[in-house]
Amino acid sequence: MNQTKYIFVTGGVTSSLGKGIIAASLAKLLQARGYRTTIQKFDPYINVDPGTLNPYEHGECYVTNDGAETDLDLGHYERFLNVPTSQANNVTTGRIYLSVIEKERRGEFLGKTVQVVPHITNEIKERMQLLGKSGDYDIVITEIGGTVGDIESLPYIESVRQLVWELGENNGIVIHLTLVPFLAAAGELKTKPTQHSVKTLMESGIKADILVCRTEYELSEDLRHKLALFCNVKREAVIQSIDASTIYDVPNLMLEEGLDKVALKKLDLPEKSTPDLKQWNEFLQKHKNPKHEVSIGLVGKYVELQDSYKSILEAFIHAGATNETKVNVISIHSEFLDVNSADEQLKGLDGILVAPGFGGRGIEGKIETVRYAREKNIPFLGICLGMQMAVIEYSRNVLGYTDANSTEMNQNTSHPVINLMEEQKTITDKGGTMRLGAWKCHLSENTLAHKIYGQSDILERHRHRYEFNSEYLEVLQKAGLKASGVNPETGLVEVIELENHPFFIGVQYHPEYKSTVLAPHPLFVSFIAAAVKHKNK
């Protein structure tokens, strides 16, 4: 292919309809037909990136290989496509305006009055085409965050209108995702909200090429025809997206509806071969027909909102399918867990994961959880802060350093077993200043970590400011807490494990970010296998 083709996905009626899942499913089908496909997300908030956003506000912050702190939808893109994303795959209004203002300060606009049109829209269009111009992709799918009609989304909608016009016929299309609600009182599905949403889009100068309708019930042929007529699309371009039991069903549902065929036809591209979803369907088969079942305790401080730990929950699904095991995740709030309630809240679990996080709230509950898992020989996995809590717990309860802590929680502790990284000590800004992205780690032979990975050198993604204090390495190792993985350049301890425990491992990095449908993360796979073994013992 000479020219990259563009697909824009907008949403109407309400937020949280699943634009990211539809975009990822379409990308999966196009990829399975042999097209090099990527997805990017444009978010209309003024934060430069989601790195400083409260997880309750926006869910998990997803970190890419190149160290970008991005929207959790990029996690879906990677899990579906098994292809890494980068900073270029996620753009916010904050980043757009920051770039334009910096250009103005440098005098790049030659004294012109800087306006939303053309300066902001030009910046948006430039970034929309960045991945396409790299030559690496045949098709770029762009998801526009928010809902059509929102004030925040207007510059993006205008940019899409201009870009579709500039690209020319068959080079750019718009998919509009909308809701067809069921009205119980009338006992029928209603198309009016969709009609109004499409009308709002048309008022902005954009005609939807394909309509994807989220619905609880099947759309009748009459209803599809009505939507096609009033929304000005072809009948075959009215696509039903019925509620599914798992998001991993959606590519098959879209294949049945012919979404990929309609998109290719409108882009004037050949269908090539039938999508090869063999491995995908093998995963689904295992996921839906488990032979085992385990209960895993997810101990964290943001458990009220499931999206806060989205990648961890998805990694459990991937690892569960590999082990032909149904993984029941029990969310446990670390703030409400202590010595007195630990047994009541944690007994009966087949494995315990202590989640990442920041700040002092709920820390003592996490430390108590580690003690419980260690003493009761329950399979344990600690991620980032969870690994740090394991070091603190061992220092307190095995070495007898009763006030051992992280300087993040207590700057005056006499045993700072977790300390602020040296390069972080001069940093004052919060945004984008942590140790981020993929870093090397060397695993020692004859360790659990080496056995899990089956290799000595790995690359994992990080997001932290604090680290294992190497001054305590020797004394902790002598006491049985092994540092089985270190950064080969800095000596930073990345992995810790217990020798005399069936499965006890803590990692400073975030393995959940790299787990995908076709490549489940070995740490999660081994953790679930250990949980199955523990249950059957």
Curated annotation (Swiss-Prot):
The record lists ATP as bound by S16, L17, G18, K19, G20, I21, D73
Q: Pathway, according to UniProt?
A: Pyrimidine metabolism; CTP biosynthesis via de novo pathway; CTP from UDP: step 2/2
Using the UniProt record, name the top-level EC class of this enzyme in a single word. Answer: ligase
**Which keywords does UniProt give here?**
ATP-binding, Glutamine amidotransferase, Ligase, Magnesium, Metal-binding, Nucleotide-binding, Pyrimidine biosynthesis
Q: What is its EC number?
A: 6.3.4.2
Residues bound to UTP are S15, K190, T191, K192, P193, T194, Q195, K226
Q: Where does CTP bind?
A: S15, D150, I151, E152, K190, T191, K192, P193, T194, Q195, K226
Which Gene Ontology BP terms does the record give? 'de novo' CTP biosynthetic process; pyrimidine nucleobase biosynthetic process
Question: How, per the record, is this protein's activity regulated?
Answer: Allosterically activated by GTP, when glutamine is the substrate; GTP has no effect on the reaction when ammonia is the substrate. The allosteric effector GTP functions by stabilizing the protein conformation that binds the tetrahedral intermediate(s) formed during glutamine hydrolysis. Inhibited by the product CTP, via allosteric rather than competitive inhibition.
Q: Which reaction does it catalyse?
A: UTP + L-glutamine + ATP + H2O = CTP + L-glutamate + ADP + phosphate + 2 H(+); L-glutamine + H2O = L-glutamate + NH4(+); UTP + NH4(+) + ATP = CTP + ADP + phosphate + 2 H(+)
Region Amidoligase domain: what ranges?
1-269
Q: Which GO terms describe its cellular component?
A: cytosol
What residues does Mg(2+) bind to? Answer: D73, E143
**Residues of the active site:** C384 (nucleophile), H510, E512
Could you tell me which Gene3D superfamilies the record lists for this protein? 3.40.50.880, P-loop containing nucleotide triphosphate hydrolases
Per UniProt, L-glutamine binds at Y56, G357, L385, G386, M387, Q388, E408, R465
Recall the GO molecular function terms of this protein's record: ATP binding; CTP synthase activity; glutaminase activity; identical protein binding; metal ion binding
UniProt xrefs under InterPro entries: Class_I_gatase-like, CTP_synthase, CTP_synthase_N, GATASE, GATase1_CTP_Synthase, P-loop_NTPase
PROSITE patterns, A to Z = GATASE_TYPE_1
- The Glutamine amidotransferase type-1 domain is annotated at 295-537
One further remark on this entry is: CTPSs have evolved a hybrid strategy for distinguishing between UTP and CTP. The overlapping regions of the product feedback inhibitory and substrate sites recognize a common feature in both compounds, the triphosphate moiety. To differentiate isosteric substrate and product pyrimidine rings, an additional pocket far from the expected kinase/ligase catalytic site, specifically recognizes the cytosine and ribose portions of the product inhibitor.
- HAMAP family xrefs: PyrG
Function in brief: Catalyzes the ATP-dependent amination of UTP to CTP with either L-glutamine or ammonia as the source of nitrogen. Regulates intracellular CTP levels through interactions with the four ribonucleotide triphosphates.
Q: Which family does it belong to?
A: Belongs to the CTP synthase family.
Subunit structure as annotated in this protein's UniProt entry: Homotetramer.
What protein name applies here?
CTP synthase
Organism equals Flavobacterium psychrophilum (strain ATCC 49511 / DSM 21280 / CIP 103535 / JIP02/86)
